[in-house]
Amino acid sequence: MDHNVNAPLRDDVRLLGDLLGECLRQQAGDSIYETVEKIRQASVATRTEGGASLASLRDLLSPLDDATLLEVARAFSQFLNLSNIAEQHHRERLHRQHQRYPGDAGTDQGLQEVLQRLADNDIAKEQISGTLEQLSVELVLTAHPTEVTRRTLIRKYDQMADLLSELDRPDFNEDERELRRERLRRVILAAWCTDEIRREKPTPVDEAKWGFATIEQSLWQAVPDVLRQLEAQLADRGLPAPPSDWAPVKLASWMGGDRDGNPNVTAPVTREVLLLARWMAADLYLRDVENLLADLSMKSASEELLAATGPTHEPYRVLLREVRSRLRLTRRQMEAQVEGLPVPEGQAYLRREELMAPLQLLDRSLRAVGLSDIADGDLKNTLRRLNCFGITLLRLDIRQESTRHSDVLDAITRYLQLGRYSDWDEAARQAFLVDELQARRPLIDAAFRDSEHCTAEVAEVLATCEVIAEQGSEGLGAYVISMATTPSDVMAVMLLQKIAGVREPMRVVPLFETLDDLDGAEQTMSALLALPFYRERVAAGQEIMIGYSDSAKDAGFLGAAWAQYRAQEKLTALFADNGIPLTLFHGRGGSISRGGSPTRMALLSQPPGSVAGRIRVTEQGEVIRFKYGRPSVAVFNLEQYVAATLEATLLPPQAARPEWRQQMQALTDTSVAGYRGVVRDEPELVRYLRTVTPETELSRLALGSRPARRKSDQGISSLRAIPWVFAWTQIRLMLPAWLGTGAALEDAQNDAAQHAMVREMASEWPFFQGVVDMLEMVLAKSDLRVAAWYEERLAGDDPGLMRLGEVLRERLTATVSALSALTGREDLLDNNPVMRWSIRVRDPYTDPLHLLQAELMARLRQQDGDETLESALMVTIAGIAAGLRNTG
C-alpha cells in the first residue's frame, strides 16, 4: 500500500473517529464511551492474539443490558459509515489530482488509457470516432432492497464529504479550518441523534423519488461534466468532437415499473411515477432556463432568431421567457394529474423535440454571431441534459413475470370459448398469437371486464398496458418478461399491448435467468426469428436480458457465470447471422453472486462481439449511492462505462479455446453438482439459514417495497436472490459466491494436466480471469471465525446444525486453499494490498457488530417484539452492510 498517497485518508478517518467519540461522550456519557473503547481495543486484540482475546471480547458484551447494546451497536455502525465517507472522499481527491486510487488501476481505466491502447493496436481514428458516435450505454436504476441507509442520513453524509473537501483547500488558514471542523462535528452530532433505522417500508413511489433525487443532486451535473471531460480527452488525441446530440450515456429505471413479485406496484402507481418524472424534469429544466435568462442578455442575434422573436433588444430572453412559461405549465399539468385536480389548459411539453427546438435556435444564433464561447457554456449543458434525460427524466421499464401474461390470455380464451390457453402446447399458443397479432379486429369487447373471467389479477395486467397506451412512448423503455422460457412468452406481451391500444409499443425484452432458460435462450429466440412478422418487428434491433441473480441461486456462482457466457455467445452469433443488432441487458447486482464486478472487468469478460458498442445494465440499491451519489464520483464511473464499452467493442477479449471450453464445462459440472448437493439436497440447510443467519430478521428491516419471498412457503426456492445473498453476507460465510466452485477447482488440481490448463485459463482468458478475481475478492471478505460465533451462540445445542456448520466452514477453507493453489499467492488479495487493507481496517469495527448481532438474535428469539432489541439488531444489520460495502 502506498502510505504517502493514503496518508490523507488515514488523517480523515482519525478526524471523523475523534469527532464521533466527542459526540458519543456528550450524548451517551463517559460510561458508554469507555465501554465502546474497551470493546474496540479487545476487538483489535482478537485479530492479533486470537482465542483468549475473543473470550474477553465476549465477556465484555454478554453482560451488557439491552439499552447499552443498542448504543454500542450504533457507535460501531456509525464509525463504519464515517470510514466509508472518508474512503469515498479519498477516491474523489485522487481523481481530481488525476491519480488512481491504489488498487483501481488493474480494474477500471479511463478514456485516456483506452485511447492509448487503441492507438498501440493501430485502430484507425475514423473507426474510433465512428464507434464513439454510435456508443450506447444505458444505466437502469433499480430499487432492489439493498440500500440500508436512510435518505436523511445520506444527506448528512454528503454534507460531511463536502466539509472534508473544504478541509483539503490549501488556501484556508487555521481559523477557517477550525470553523469547518466545528461544522463537521455538528453534522456528525446531528447524524448520531438521528434514528438510523427506517421504521416504515418505502412505497414504490418513495423509491422512485429516491431515484429522482439521485438525478437531481448528482447526475444532472455529472452528465454534462463527463461529456465535457470526454470531449477534451478526444481533442487531446486529435480526434474530432462528437456531434452536438451525442449522448453515449442514458438513464432508465425500474422504480415504479418493476411489478415482478411486488403487489405494491400497480397500474396507478406506474402512472403516478411517470407523471412525477415529467414533473421533476420540468422543474429541473426550469432551473436551467432561469440561469440562461440571467446569462443570455446579449442583443446580437441571427436573422432566424429575430424572425421568431420580433424586434427586441433582448431576443434570447424573449424566447427563453416563452420556454419558461411552457415549462411552468408543464409542471402545473403534471402536478394536477398526480394530485387528481383539474388540469390547467394549454400546450405542455410532451416530446423532447418540442423543448429542443427553441434551445437549438438559441444555440445556432449565438454561433452565427460569433458567440460560440457563450453557446458552449450553460446552454450546451442544458442541451446535453435534454439529449440524455429527455423531458421524462428517465425511461421507465415495466417488468412482469411471464405466467401473469399467460393467465390473462387464458382468461380471454375461456371468455371467447376457445378453450384454455394454459392447456395448449407451445405450437398452438404460437399459432393463436401470430393470428391475433396480425388480425385487424379487436380480440375482446368491453364486456370482458365485467365477466367472471376478468379477475383482479387479470384486470391489473390489462390496466398496466392501458397506462402504457395513455402515457405514450416518450417516458417508457423496455417491457421485461421475467422467467421467460418460450417464444409465446414474448408474443403474449406484444398481443396484450395491442389489446390495450398501444400505438407505439414498448420493446419486449425476454429475461433468461435460470440455468435451463439460459441454455434454451438461443432456441427460443431462433424460433421467434423464424416467424416473418417477428423478424420484421425487430429488424432495427433486439434486446435480451441476462439474469445473474436467479441463475446463481439456481446453479451457484461458477455454473451461472458459464451459462451466462455461453448464452451470450450463442445469442450474439444468432443475431449476427440474421443481420439484426443485439443489445444485451445485464441484470447485475452489487455482490459477485448477483453479477457484481468492476466495470471494466465486467465488460471485458463478456464474449467477443457481444458488446458491439451497446450495453444496458442495472445499477441496484446501495451501488447507486456509491457510484453515482456525488457528482465527481458519478463523472468517474460514467467515464468508466464509456471507456470500457469502447474498449470491449474495438479490442474484444480473446475467444475461448476449445480446450478451455471443455475444461470450463468440466469445472461447471462439478461445481453445479456440489452447489445443488447442499442447497437442494441438504435437509438441514433451510433450518441453518433460518437459525444461524438473520434471514428471518431481515424481513423486519424496512429496506424496500418488495416482499422478500415470491410465495408464502418458507423454502429456499421461494426466497428472492437478494435476501438469500444478504443473509449469508451478514454472517461472513458468503456461501452463494463460492459453494461448489472450490470443489471444482480441487477436482481439477488432482490432475496435473487439468491443473495446468486451469492456470493457463486464469492467466490468458479474460472471462476466467474475472471469475477468479471476483472469487478472491469475496473470499477475502469471508471469515470462518465470525460464522462460527453465530453457530455457537444460536445453534450450540443443535448437533445437526453444528455438523452442517462445520461442513460448510471446511468447504470454505478448502475453497481458499484451492484458489491459492491456482493463483500461486499465499494470502488472499496479495495482488491488491489496498483492498486487503480496506477490509482489515474495518474488521475491529465489524467484529463487535457480528458478536452483538448473534447476541441480539438470541435475546430476540426469547423476547420477541422487544423494541430496543429490534432496533439494536437493525443497527447491526446496517452496520455490517456498511462495513462490507455490499449487501445483496
UniProtKB/Swiss-Prot annotation:
Main EC class the enzyme belongs to: lyase
| Cofactors (names) | Mg(2+)
Q: What does this protein do, in the record's words?
A: Forms oxaloacetate, a four-carbon dicarboxylic acid source for the tricarboxylic acid cycle.
Listed GO biological process terms: carbon fixation; oxaloacetate metabolic process; tricarboxylic acid cycle
Write down the EC number. Answer: 4.1.1.31
The question of whether Lyase is a record keyword is answered with yes
Q: Which NCBIfam families match?
A: PRK00009.1
Per the record, what are the reactions this protein catalyses? oxaloacetate + phosphate = phosphoenolpyruvate + hydrogencarbonate
A Pfam family that this protein carries is PEPcase
User: What is the name attached to this protein's record?
Assistant: Phosphoenolpyruvate carboxylase
Gene name linked to the record: ppc
- GO MF term set: magnesium ion binding; phosphoenolpyruvate carboxylase activity
- What species was this sequence derived from? Alcanivorax borkumensis (strain ATCC 700651 / DSM 11573 / NCIMB 13689 / SK2)
Keywords of the record, alphabetical order, are:
Carbon dioxide fixation, Lyase, Magnesium
GO CC entries: cytosol
InterPro entries membership: PEP_COase, PEP_COase_bac/pln-type, PEP_COase_Lys_AS, PEPCASE_His_AS, Pyrv/PenolPyrv_kinase-like_dom
* Similarity comment: family membership: Belongs to the PEPCase type 1 family.
KW Oxidoreductase (keyword) present: no
Q: Where is the active site?
A: 144, 553
